[in-house]
A protein has these predicted regions:
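Glycine-rich phosphate-binding loop and adjoining helix at the ATP-binding site
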Residues: 27-71, 75-141
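Glycine/GP-enriched mid-protein hinge/lid loop-to-helix segment characteristic of carbohydrate kinases
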Residues: 2-47, 51-52, 117-118, 131-202
Length: 202
């Protein structure tokens, strides 16, 4: 988890990042499972659409560690306003589909300091478009791609950020499949490329 202080300037309508940053690692927790494998995405989608999300025991334990880590980060902050962004598909209560980690359907209820969970890809694009150090401040039409464990992606058209939650015929990289059945994200993200290299090199 990366913590970053920032100020919103009402006059310029820009986000001004502070120099303070701190990172918290799930892997620092003694019970974190590095080899955790989430349920297949299609199974997760079916469970969500049918209104019956069935978490595995390991998924619950991983999710508890995520909540503990977020809670710790918030408790160490000296801020009156907190925003949280996270990967995965969300409903009003939590994370219901997750490609690279545990689903936490009751996330928001367990973190009292927040009233919404924002999409991490959307926040990456918002930061680049509306931060004083953003590289897309004057962009009218562009595609944003950022790499890490997965891929953060976004589209700007006519100066407006496309909302993937509203425009359903546009897919994110982890939803797009190659001819081999792999996701674009698993092929192009830094973590995915490393995993693929290790697998092919034996």
């Amino acid at each position: 988890i990366m913590v970053q202080y920032a100020t919103f300037d009402n006059r310029s309508k820009k986000i001004i990042p502070d120099n303070f940053q701190k990172e918290y690692f799930y892997s620092d927790h003694a019970k974190w499972k590095h080899d955790f494998i989430p349920k297949p995405i299609d199974d997760q989608r079916i469970e969500y659409s049918e209104g019956h999300i069935c978490l595995t025991d390991t998924e619950i334990k991983q999710g508890n560690i995520v909540i503990e880590t977020v809670t710790k980060a918030i408790s160490e902050l000296n801020s009156h306003s907190i925003g949280l962004c996270f990967p995965g598909i969300k409903n009003k209560d939590g994370i219901v589909v997750m490609a690279n980690g545990p689903r936490i359907p009751d996330f928001k209820k367990r973190i009292k300091e927040i009233d919404a969970i924002y999409n991490d890809s959307d926040c990456c694009v918002i930061g680049e478009c509306h931060s004083t150090i953003g590289k897309l401040q004057d962009a009218e039409n562009c595609i944003y791609i950022g790499g890490g464990t997965g891929i953060a992606d976004g589209i700007v058209i006519n100066g407006e950020i496309i909302d993937f939650n509203v425009v359903h015929d546009v897919k994110r990289s982890w939803e797009l499949l190659t001819q081999t059945g792999e996701t674009v994200e698993s092929c192009l993200s830094p973590a995915g490329m490393i995993e693929r290299y290790n697998r092919l090199s034996g």
